[in-house]
Amino acid sequence: RSYATKISRRFAKDTFSVSAGLSYQDDEVDSGVPGGPALGIQSKRTPELMLGLYRMLDAYSSVSFNLTYGRPKGYLSDPYKQIGATETLFPGDPLLEQDVFYLYPENRPDKRDTFTAYLEGKKYFSELEGSLETSYRFFADNSDLQGHTIELKWLQRVGEKIVLQPLYRFYKQSQADFYNITLDGTGISPSLQPNGNTPYYSADYRLSDLSTSTFGIKITYFKTQDLSFDLSLDRYLVKGRDGVTDQRVYPDAKVMTLGMQWEF
């Protein structure tokens, strides 16, 4: 379940606006997945506070800026993710001693502070019948994870009914302070069940030092004023940057999306 409210005020003949919003998301996470911690249904609650500014620079260009603070709380681990640790059985016994690699559920903090800043600019070029949209997004949380996203998008009208949207997006992030590919050498003794308390640990590659590039194009066909169809093709490339995580865990993807929008 999610709830949201927003207020907005316009100034300078509607060319400048200030907005503020509050949202609350109440989720339930089923931890009883195969290989998961089997803690049953766990709660996850995410309140967010947003402040936004919008400025129309002229008839063809605008800029907007948003700040968002969130504080997720509850079960924040991923029940599908595990981390390994090597343990020695029967140490000192010349016949029975052996190393065994065990898997444990990850253990993330049960509280998180997130900060997001988003800057977007739009410019319409009348002679080309197209517009350029550029944006930059900064994200950070209290586990030292920082992310930077740059996106460029061109919207080109072709005739009266078709719009082409080529896109490029680049994302780069630093790793969370509790990310490790294994627990070997960390001195951490994992618990059998995640509890949200220290020590924290996760081998989820999405928390590692990585970069991604997305190349895409979208074609929208406006059948009528109220009905449109679209086709998107995206190429998604991911690269690990820590020199430790196996590159094979980073997924590349080709994605095709079909859509329809009907307003009534």
Task: Give the location of each predicted region.
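Outer-membrane beta-barrel channels and translocator barrels
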Residues: 11-14, 56-60, 126-128, 159-161, ...
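General secondary-structure edge motif
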Residues: 33, 45, 101-102, 134, ...
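Face-selective signature of the C-terminal outer-membrane beta-barrel domain
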Residues: 61-63, 113-119, 131-135
